[in-house]
Amino acid sequence: MNWAISNLTGGNRVSRAILVRYSSVPLADATNDGSSTAPQTPTASTPRPSSSHSSLSSTFAATFLHASSRHIPGRAVPRQNANGQNGGKGNASGAGGGAGGGGAGGASGGTGGTGAQAAGQLSLPLDVEETVTCFCRKARRKERDGDQNSTDTKLYLEESVLERKLPEADLKALVDLPAGLDYNEWLASHTLALFEHVNLVYGTISEFCTQSGCADMTGPGNRTYLWFDEKGKKTRVAAPQYIDYVMTFTQKTVSDESIFPTKYANEFPGSFESIARKILRLQFHVIAHLYAAHFREIALLGLHTHLNLTFAHLTALHRRFNLIDEKETDVLRDLEVALRLTDDTGGCQDATSTTSSVHDHSHSGDLQHQSLQQQQQHHNSSSNSTSSAEAFHVNSQSNNGSTSASASVSLIDGDAVAPPICTQPEAGAGCKPAGSSGLLGGILGDLTSGEFGDTTRYCTSAVPQAAAAAGAGVGGTAIGATDAAALNNGAGALHLNFSNNNNNNHNLNHHHHHHHHHGHHGHHHAAQQQQQHSGLIQCNAAGGGGNATGVATGGATAAASSTTTA
């Protein structure tokens, strides 16, 4: 058996790849002068003249197609008779070609009868198995690549690559809204930072993310992401194209002055939070694709810690302000658990740790009670109520008659009486005590809880005017929380820092904001000596007039919380 490769068109790669098996196929060849020769069987040792290449190809094609039609199942095959009817037809056509000039057509017609008789000797002109293998080689290679990627989808859960640079406490402090800072301003800074980090990590492995290797934008668990164009039409695009759309849209959005303002006179639009949610959701899609399809390359480059930290940053921000739908983040929930960003049940770990902290502090109740009595004697406080109070700080403890309550995310009612006047979400405390009056600019914020769920209530702490006047009298020293309890404040205040600077709480130092949106300037009002003081109040409200012990800080802390002058 000999093997030959048919070259039907000369430029068709698929045609050259068809393997033909034959035993003795009579092929007509032509010499340089155009005269026909006797049919010969080509072998590996018989070279073919280059001048007769086209004639040989056409003759072999005719013989190959005629012979192959006899072996295709289900097709009617014309029966050969003794008179050689098929050969006669070939002779008739060959005669016409010979009358025109006696070229290769005549030679083909002259040998038509012999070719028809020799066609019966063709055993199997088309090896189906080899041809199918040739055609499907590329598809099988792609299938093997897909199987390899599917086995590596959980590579990011290996213990050796579960590394990140910051512990949980630092991540929590990273996303907590600073007191006095606008919520949109804080959200804009984190959105810009996450966009830059995701773009940098993807840029390191972008050459591995190709149209052929990543034909679809996929995530863990065979999650597929479709792109929605400006008209809302779903489009199935490759991963590189999808990520290019994401980065282009994000860059165009953050560069828009009307959406991300950088000048003092410009304000954030009312729909800014929804725009930021969309940007963060698209960035999460890119992170999910990096974990699902390119984590091996990222780990080999030693960039897995950076990717884990970026994911932890986005997850902490989402858990703090509830920015992404849970259906989107479910694909990487196992990674959240592995990185200890959340527990298996999806509950709030901070509330549990806060509750245990309250029980631990109850063992030292006698010592704290003595300190409380000393502070009451020093400030002449007369409040001895037995109402319940919520203790969240390490130095906060109620009296012997009060009952400690654990933190709960369902304490705030959506129909609370107190109106929202600040931008700090609060889910672990009441909104406003009944007997409070003379509101300052203090922000009530539970910095020990990171879960808010769907709660969007905003609360403020209340400090009576008498407490503010007492703060002015001591000249910048901190006031203990017992004063607030004695004056019907009703809040377990922590870190009360007051100063005599009167800048209307307008220019707080934005140290946490590296993108200088809305740089505020201080305004002097020296002529008006008001009794209004700026300060940072970070506490948890408590019902009634329960006594709570606060940590008094003075001097440097009070100066740090004061406003700056131009």
Curated annotation (Swiss-Prot):
Q: Name one GO molecular function term.
A: metal ion binding
What Pfam families would the database entry show?
Mob1_phocein (PF03637)
Q: Where is the composition biased (Polar residues)?
A: 394-407
Q: What does this protein do?
A: Required for the normal morphogenesis of a variety of polarized outgrowths including epidermal hairs, bristles, arista laterals, and dendrites.
Q: Which family is this sequence assigned to? A: Belongs to the MOB1/phocein family.
Q: What quaternary structure, including any partners, is listed in this protein's UniProt entry?
A: Interacts with and activates trc, also interacts with wts.
- The protein's name in its UniProt record: MOB kinase activator-like 2
- The scientific name of the source species is Drosophila melanogaster (Fruit fly)
